[in-house]
Amino acid sequence: MIIFPAIDLLNEKCVRLTQGDYNQVEVFNSDPVAQAKIFESQGAKFLHMVDLDGAKEGSQKNFDVIKRVREAINIPIQVGGGIRDEERIRLLLDLGVDRVILGTAAVKNLPFLQEMLDKYGDKIVVSVDAKEGKVATHGWIEDSGIDSVEFVKKLISMGLKTLVYTDIAKDGMMEGTNLSVYEIINKLDINLIASGGVSRMYDIEELLKMDTYGAIVGKAIYAGALNLEELIKLCDNYDK
């Protein structure tokens, strides 16, 4: 299982939101490039980055930061947040970003998603943010009313290979993750990256037992509740 340490960008700083609330912001590092280097030095194999300004406003105001992070580290990077057209996808891929994560764009416009999957294949990841079993869009602000597991099945039928699934109610709460929903999705034919509330060794161990492809860990690392090096070691030893 791959541990994806998370860098969430807001105003060019590395932050974490609680439950996706832009009014509950905690700055963990004002230098995201330095943070990315720390994660790489601790053994991270893949970095997860989200442009929160982009997710909310559809802009890419943190583009320069993403570029500098890409130039500073050698591990693969996946980037999401406000990517709603092919031009943004192309720009990020040209920059050397390995995977581009679509959220709102995928939920709102399935023909567009199909076109991007046909064109860019496994470089496209879809992020499904769910609240009480329903898909949420626009930086977690709107509820689409779409059943999240049914939507995942639809994405698989379209050829999607990798999915980030976030349980919004759990995100940034340090209360553990929604293992029951991950169990359902893990039975489907898709690489699941679990996100939201991964804050205890127990969560990681349970996700490992389910043969989960990956887990995004953010606040728990910054707050010191989990040690990134230990998590990576646990996963490496489990996979042997």
PLM regions with names:
Residues D8, F39, L47, L92, ...:
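Conserved, mostly hydrophobic/aromatic
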Residues E12-C14, Q19-N23, R90, V97-D171:
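Conserved anion-binding
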Residues I3, G54-R70, R84-R90, T104-V125, ...:
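Active-site-adjacent beta->alpha loops and helix N-cap segments on the catalytic face
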Residues I73, I77-R99, S180-G214:
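Catalytic cores of alpha/beta
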Residues F28-E40, R84-R90, S144-K154, I204:
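Short, acidic/polar
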Residues M1-I3, G43-F46, I73-I77, V97-D98, ...:
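Short, well-ordered coil/turn segments that N-cap beta-strands
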